[in-house]
């Protein structure tokens, strides 16, 4: 599987590298699980609704979500900070 980050998601990911290594470690663990198991596993994966067809989210923390979509051999990461479209 190949990871493809939206520009804002990549900025979020880089932000975590300087702000909270523990959260960054959790994001990396969730990404590994997505690559291995798709839409099952930790972080309570759930599909997004209301116009976000095909996108899923997992809980990183109580405040932050990892939003992604699995397309063939790619995992497209849309966000990894805050809730959904914030």
Located regions from the model:
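Short beta-strand micro-motifs in enzyme catalytic cores
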Residues: 54-56
């Amino acid at each position: 599987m190949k990871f493809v980050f939206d520009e804002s998601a990549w900025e979020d990911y880089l932000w975590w590298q300087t702000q909270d290594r523990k959260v960054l470690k959790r994001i990396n663990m969730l990404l590994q699980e997505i690559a291995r198991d798709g839409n099952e596993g930790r972080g309570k994966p759930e599909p997004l609704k209301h116009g976000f067809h095909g996108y899923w989210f997992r809980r990183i923390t109580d405040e932050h979500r990892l939003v992604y979509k699995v397309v063939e051999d790619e995992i497209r990461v849309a966000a990894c900070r805050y809730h959904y479209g914030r």
